[in-house]
Amino acid sequence: MKMFPTALLALALAAAGTAWAGPIAETQQSTLGLLSFDLPAEQTGSFEVSFDATPLADKMDGFTGISAAAPKNANDVAAMVRFNDAGTIDVRDGGSFRADRELGYSANKVYRMRMVIDLARKKYSVYVAPAGQPEVQLAANYAFRTQQAGVRALGKLVLAGYKNANGVFAGAHRVSGVSVKAASTP
């Protein structure tokens, strides 16, 4: 993994419990807490964010999401896709996480994720392609996180890791190959 000075600084700040906001490098890794990185441009319409996500442990708890600004906590993140501690991938829908279909994950496997975001409607859909497999739709027209119903623009990619039910940080995930483009019909 190629680490850039900004990524190293972000990891150090996160370890100290301080939020980080900066540009997206080639590869970013979550840690305990929130890290945020600038999208290439602030988004105000319908758009897609695609990226490769790799969980570094089984049954971890971490998400990748999109927010308006550097988040202070998870309530500030509008759209999220998560590797949960039950070993499946789920998506935030308003006030809770769920998925339209169950998709398990394994440590150190790459999952191509695509979030199709409709900012005007405050809805998004999520598609995931496990390495070597076709893309599947996990979420169709899910609502933004309840606290983000009034957001007008999105400009940050957010990575986060959390402690599991036993109070232990169970692992991080990596994100690479981030791309942003105008939304196409799924």
Regions found by a protein language model. Name each.
Residues 8-15:
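Bacterial N-terminal signal peptides
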Residues 22-89, 182:
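Secretory/extracellular carbohydrate-interaction modules
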Residues 1-8:
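Bacterial N-terminal signal peptides that target proteins for export
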Residues 17-21:
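Sec/Tat signal peptide C-region and signal peptidase I cleavage site
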Residues 129-154:
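Short, solvent-exposed beta-strand-to-loop segments that form ligand-recognition rims
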Residues 165-177:
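Extracellular carbohydrate recognition
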Residues 109-117, 124-126:
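Short tryptophan-centered beta-strand motifs in secreted/extracellular beta-sheet-rich domains
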Residues 91-112:
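Short, aromatic/His-centered strand-loop micro-motif at the edge of beta-sheets
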